[in-house]
Regions:
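N-terminal basic, amphipathic alpha-helical segments
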Residues: 1-12, 236, 242, 252-254, ...
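Conserved PLP-binding active-site segment of the aspartate aminotransferase-like
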Residues: 304-309, 326-366
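Hydrophobic "anchor" residues on beta-strands that sit immediately upstream
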Residues: 132, 166, 203
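Conserved core of the PLP fold type I
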Residues: 10-163, 174-197, 312, 364-377
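Conserved core segment of the aminotransferase class I/II
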Residues: 50, 191-272, 372
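Conserved glycine-rich beta-strand-loop-beta hairpin in the small C-terminal domain of fold type I
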Residues: 265-279, 291-306
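Short amphipathic alpha-helices in soluble, non-transmembrane regions
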Residues: 315-321, 359-364
Length: 378
């Protein structure tokens, strides 16, 4: 068990001799930096290891940019207008952060290869009020898409009108595969930005929240030397150091990237039947009817369902009446407003496969009822 990886009789010193019970070590113990770097596909010198939540790091990055600016640029809070690009459907908690700071959010359509890069380039390269973009590049939330090599390279080669434009690269599902033989891979955005002469343009985030424990994992940020130095100026005021015992616990338990991957195979064995239960019902009951579309992801934590336009809220409401609680329709869009009222995020992780199949049966029944009502109303 992970909780037994360290105990009262353990040597509680990091590999460099740091006593993990003490204060200090702002950016994480060396072995934890190595573990997170390997997980994220980068190198330890790009890493700061924080506490348990990558969302906390993302919030801090936006907050810091808002109050103190990035690398000497004007703090966003002093500007008349700040905009963020939001690939949709996307992660509601990303959108909640930017909405909290009063940042204007712009929808960017997604495809199986990633965001519409023509739109991204048009906005980023020509509008200096565009300061960032939210990205879940691998097994995206909620669609399960992985950005293509071309998409990653186009991101790295952006020519932002704003010097302080940043890509918020939330690599939440970087090792969260569902299958051993069908796994998506993605280019390392850090090295691609370096090759393109844009080393400072990206903040990458990841955590072990869906690897070890949701509230007790470790989280990390990867970025350039200049960005890390800038962040540490504030971080040294904010904290004396994060939970090094938890960092040590994770390294002692997983040991290395191979240990992480082997552990995630066990997760996949639990998750895969749940996803397949939903997909089987969707394919059997809705396949070929033209009243919904979905994608079979190879990893991540969600299935994205697109109903007929104008039907999502009613489908979710009918499901709730019948005892199946879904994520609110519209949650996958900024401000909770899906322009087409069609996207529904399905999260299969919690119920058993049998419960999931039963819930999926009810879901497709509601889809059919609402769709028929919609068609008859025309």
């Amino acid at each position: 068990m992970a909780r037994d990886a360290i105990n009262a009789s353990s040597d509680l010193k990091a590999e460099n001799g740091t006593d993990c019970r003490n204060y200090g070590v702002l950016d994480g113990i060396p072995e934890a930096k190595k573990l997170m770097a390997d997980m994220m596909g980068t190198t330890p010198e790009h890493i700061i290891v924080y506490g348990n939540a990558s969302l906390n790091i993302m919030y801090d990055q936006v907050s810091r940019a808002y109050t103190h600016g990035i690398l000497g640029n004007t703090p966003w809070g002093r500007l008349d207008k700040v905009k963020f690009l939001c690939p949709v459907p996307g992660y509601d908690r990303h959108f909640a952060i930017t909405e909290h700071f009063g940042i204007e959010m712009i929808n960017i359509p997604m495809s199986e290869s990633g965001p519409d890069m023509d739109m991204v380039e048009q906005y980023v390269n020509n509008d200096e009020t565009v300061k960032g973009i939210w990205c879940v590049p691998k097994y995206s939330n909620p669609q399960g898409f992985t950005y293509s090599d071309e998409t990653v390279k186009r991101f790295a080669n952006l020519k932002p009108a704003a010097k302080d434009f940043r890509i918020f690269w939330d690599n939440a599902y970087v090792i969260h595969h569902l299958y051993d033989d069908k796994q998506d891979e993605i280019l390392d955005i850090i090295s691609e930005c370096e090759k393109a002469g844009n080393p400072d343009m990206v903040f990458e985030f990841a955590s072990t929240s869906k690897v070890s424990f949701p509230g007790s994992g470790i989280a990390a940020l990867a970025s350039s030397e200049a960005n890390l130095a800038d962040i540490k100026k504030s971080l040294t005021i904010q904290t004396i150091g994060y939970d090094k015992l938890n960092q040590l616990r994770h390294v002692r338990y997983f040991k290395d990237i191979n240990g992480l991957k082997e552990h995630m195979r066990k997760h996949a064995e639990q998750m895969r039947p749940k996803f397949e239960a939903v997909l089987e019902v969707l394919n059997t009951e809705l396949g070929g009817l033209g009243i919904g579309s979905w994608y079979a992801p190879r990893g991540g934590y969600f299935i994205s369902f697109d109903a007929m336009e104008g039907c999502a809220k009613e489908i979710v409401a009918k499901c709730k009446e019948a005892g199946v609680k879904l994520t609110n329709a519209g949650a996958t869009f900024p401000y909770g407003k899906d322009p087409k009222d069609s996207n529904i995020r399905i999260a299969p992780s919690f119920p058993t496969p049998e419960e999931m199949a039963q819930a999926a049966d009810l879901f497709v029944l509601c889809v059919k009822l609402v769709s028929v009502e919609k068609l008859l109303a025309k």
